[in-house]
């Protein structure tokens, strides 16, 4: 999607994927800890996550909207792989973390923009 310049769509699906992976992993620690799945997600986060977040944090208001949209999408769509009610506590914890990330883009907006500018990254 990023190569096709569908950047906002890429950010949205990345955050949906992160949300669902994290509550699956947290709710199934015994299966996931030290697993190949976990290693693959770590590699994905380092490669694709870096690129997606470099773009996403360039427009903090859009990022907040995308986080809200990802949460709403997760809420309104079933998860056949990991039903939400089977990991309700883990899901609540992950949602709280995502909401804290969203809030940090408000609380630390000036600092985020300044750091991006210092690193030669665009603020949109």
What function would you assign to each model-found segment?
Residues 2-3:
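Hydrophobic/aromatic side-chain positions at a characteristic register within alpha-helices
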Residues 30-124:
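Long, low-complexity, acidic Ser/Pro- and Gly-enriched intrinsically disordered regions
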Residues 20-30:
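Boundary/linker segments of alpha-helical solenoid repeat arrays
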């Amino acid at each position: 999607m990023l190569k096709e310049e569908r950047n906002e769509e890429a950010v949205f699906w990345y955050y949906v994927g992160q949300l669902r992976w994290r509550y699956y992993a947290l709710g199934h620690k015994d299966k996931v800890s030290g697993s190949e799945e976990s290693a693959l997600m770590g590699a994905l986060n380092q490669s694709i996550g870096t690129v997606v977040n470099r773009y996403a944090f360039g427009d903090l208001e859009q990022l907040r909207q995308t986080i809200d949209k990802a949460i709403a999408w997760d809420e309104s769509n079933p998860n056949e792989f990991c039903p939400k009610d089977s990991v309700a506590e883990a899901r609540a914890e992950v949602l709280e973390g995502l909401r804290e990330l969203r809030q940090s883009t408000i609380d630390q907006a000036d600092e985020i923009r300044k750091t991006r500018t210092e690193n030669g990254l665009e603020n949109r």
